[in-house]
């Protein structure tokens, strides 16, 4: 009987996750995951997007209370907008809560002024993430007072499905968007592993409201998926002999280690990647003069790599028989324990 683990151990696994923040804000990030088996980019991208946009917890304003106003079809003296417009604007306020219990925050303004979210007195437990967001326009010598209830939740909750079944008279429930992720898009491109060029590279663009950073949001979404899928693993894995027989190889198993697993400087790593050097075996077959002819590769990078190779009793210019092996990816996985 074939080993069950061959169903997943023979698949290529992503070994690089890169997070690139946009210079103007920390709330937007580009996440690159590679390499993936063909088709897995679309599978993972779609699943991650759906979880990011639906299942993360966040905070939102769930109800408001304005003196002498009992429902959303009223008007507020001195306020240019009617109550329904004010509610629509309040729905756009992005909040962050440092506690899990509900909190009531208060707004008090005197006209003439443009009332913004930054005027709200939030106390220590609530933070306004978009303080310049406009709530309404207040006329001269007119005062506006308001209490706003903030809660923690997930997804989008309609006012008709509010957590509060019995709101006090005068308190108006509003639709609440708890999700801290504002947008998620993704695309899939080809990436190269060895001589194979049709593996998947998943590129995701994630924007949050600042309640969580994009990289944290992606991590939480991945954990949610992991927890949901765990139940499907309804079998016991067979204990396999992990003793690696290195004498079956015509070369050192260290040559099967990927160069991107080495602790190289960014410059050295990029030079090797651009020259299509994937494994240490690819690297040691090169001579020092070969390496120095590589674009942007200098003596400093050469010495750095020589020191690392020496730790494995390896050097440049080695004669490696039968390199590269046809099943190099499978061998690399099989002998992983011997060089880690």
From Swiss-Prot:
Region of interest (Alpha N-terminal domain (alpha-NTD)), ranges: 1-236
Gene3D superfamilies according to UniProt: 5' to 3' exonuclease, C-terminal subdomain, DNA-directed RNA polymerase, insert domain, RNA polymerase, RBP11-like subunit
A GO cellular component entry from the record: cytoplasm
Region (Alpha C-terminal domain (alpha-CTD)): 251-340
Catalyzed reaction equations: RNA(n) + a ribonucleoside 5'-triphosphate = RNA(n+1) + diphosphate
EC number: 2.7.7.6
GO BP field: DNA-templated transcription
Assembly description: Homodimer. The RNAP catalytic core consists of 2 alpha, 1 beta, 1 beta' and 1 omega subunit. When a sigma factor is associated with the core the holoenzyme is formed, which can initiate transcription.
Designated name of the protein: DNA-directed RNA polymerase subunit alpha
Gene expressing this chain: rpoA
């Amino acid at each position: 009987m074939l080993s069950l683990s061959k169903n997943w151990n023979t698949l290529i696994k992503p070994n690089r996750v890169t997070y690139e923040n946009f210079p103007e804000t920390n709330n937007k990030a580009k996440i690159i995951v590679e390499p993936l088996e063909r088709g897995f980019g679309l599978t993972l991208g779609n699943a991650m997007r759906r979880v990011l946009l639906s299942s993360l917890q966040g905070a939102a304003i769930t109800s408001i209370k304005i003196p002498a106003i009992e429902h959303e079809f009223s008007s507020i003296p001195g306020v240019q907008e009617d109550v329904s417009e004010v509610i629509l604007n309040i729905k756009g306020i992005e909040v962050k809560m440092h506690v899990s219990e509900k909190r009531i925050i208060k707004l008090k303004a005197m006209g003439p002024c443009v009332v913004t979210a930054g005027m709200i007195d939030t106390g220590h437990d609530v933070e306004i993430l978009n303080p310049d967001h406009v709530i309404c326009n207040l006329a001269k010598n007119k005062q506006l007072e308001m209490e706003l209830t903030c809660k923690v939740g997930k997804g989008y909750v309609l006012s008709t499905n509010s957590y509060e079944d019995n709101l006090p008279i005068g308190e108006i429930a509003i639709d609440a968007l708890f999700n801290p992720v504002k947008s998620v898009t993704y695309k899939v491109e080809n990436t190269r592993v060895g001589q194979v060029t049709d593996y998947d590279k998943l590129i995701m663009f994630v924007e949050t409201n600042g309640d969580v950073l994009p990289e944290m949001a992606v991590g939480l979404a991945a954990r949610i998926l992991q927890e949901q899928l765990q139940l499907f693993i309804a079998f016991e894995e067979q204990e396999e002999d992990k003793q690696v027989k290195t004498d079956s190889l015509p070369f050192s198993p260290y040559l099967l280690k990927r160069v991107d697993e080495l602790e190289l400087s960014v410059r050295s790593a990029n030079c090797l990647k651009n020259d299509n050097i994937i494994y240490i075996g690819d690297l040691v077959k090169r001579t020092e003069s070969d390496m120095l002819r590589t674009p942007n590769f200098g003596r400093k990078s050469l010495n750095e790599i020589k020191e690392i190779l020496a730790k494995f009793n390896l050097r440049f210019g080695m004669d490696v028989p039968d390199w590269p092996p046809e099943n190099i990816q499978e061998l690399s996985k099989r002998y992983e324990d011997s060089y880690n």
